[in-house]
Regions:
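Short, well-structured alpha-helical segments that form the helix of a local strand-helix-strand
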Residues: 1-6
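Noncatalytic accessory or regulatory domains flanking protease catalytic cores in secreted, cell-surface
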Residues: 9-23, 108-166
């Protein structure tokens, strides 16, 4: 890391609008941990979710949200690491309709939906009562890395602040 700083000293750790550190990103890649995460399977928000997993849902409307209730309480001084990523919609202006890019054709940027990520106590429903959040308005990634101070039941909320395309 630049200047021998670690993630806990980065602007991203301290600022809710900066999801990744400029030098460190989200930190060191642990390939085995990534394997474990994907091996645990997809867990939609229809039931409580385990501490390790992933989901591939969509949110199409501004103001819509998905809550992921963690299936066990978080203990004091434990760490929460959660990441939300999504794609910007770009369409090919396919003038000859062959469904392939040809020289001279262009792309149309449909804009970037603004999604936000919140760590909340399970009983709270207002996002302004969050414990921590990642709320960048210019990135297609949100990331929370947070040390739990108050043990208890938590949920992760994915919130659509602004949907510019669906």
């Amino acid at each position: 890391a630049k200047n021998n700083r670690d993630w806990l000293e980065s602007e991203a750790y301290q600022n809710r609008q900066i999801p990744l550190d400029y030098q460190l990103g989200a930190g060191q890649l642990n390939a085995f941990r990534a394997y474990q995460q994907f091996s645990s399977g997809q867990h939609p928000p229809t039931a409580s979710v385990p501490p390790v997993g992933w989901d591939y849902q969509t949110i199409d409307t501004s103001g819509e949200y998905q809550d992921y209730l963690l299936d066990r309480p978080l203990v004091e001084n434990s760490w929460v690491s959660t990441t939300l990523v999504w794609d910007r919609l770009v369409e090919l202006r396919d003038t000859n309709q062959n469904n392939e890019y040809d020289v001279g054709e262009a792309f149309r940027d449909r804009g970037l939906n603004r999604l936000e990520l919140y760590l909340m106590h399970v009983e709270d429903n207002q996002i302004d009562r969050n414990v921590w959040a990642s709320t960048s308005n210019v990135d297609s990634i949100q990331h929370i890395f947070y040390q739990v101070r108050d043990p208890g039941k938590y949920k992760i909320r994915v919130y659509s602040r602004q949907a510019v395309n669906a």
